[in-house]
Swiss-Prot record:
Protein name stated in the entry: COP9 signalosome complex subunit 7
Compartmental location: Cytoplasm; Nucleus
GO biological process terms on file: red, far-red light phototransduction
Task performed by this protein: Component of the COP9 signalosome complex (CSN), a complex involved in various cellular and developmental processes such as photomorphogenesis and auxin and jasmonate responses. The CSN complex is an essential regulator of the ubiquitin (Ubl) conjugation pathway by mediating the deneddylation of the cullin subunits of SCF-type E3 ligase complexes, leading to decrease the Ubl ligase activity of SCF. It is involved in repression of photomorphogenesis in darkness by regulating the activity of COP1-containing Ubl ligase complexes.
UniProt gene name: CSN7
Length: 71
């Protein structure tokens, strides 16, 4: 499970459309809201914010709730 999330985050951070198409069967389908939240977390992570701060930016009260939503 953690490996799948790691692949997804790496794809969002460094991947291309072609990378997504090649890996689409190995990563979970995301809704438009989940995609925007993934991109938001990556943008915030660049500024070295704490995980809890990142989760509050996407309206998550608990860090674990945020992880579940991003899956």
């Amino acid at each position: 499970q953690a490996e799948i999330i790691d692949q997804l985050v790496r794809l969002f951070a460094h991947g291309t459309w072609g990378d997504y198409k090649c890996n689409a069967s190995r990563i979970p389908q995301l809704s438009p809201d989940q995609i925007l939240k993934q991109l938001t977390v990556l943008t915030l992570a660049e500024s070295n914010k704490k995980w809890a701060d990142n989760m509050s930016e996407i309206d998550k009260k608990e860090a674990e709730e945020g992880v579940e939503e991003l899956k």
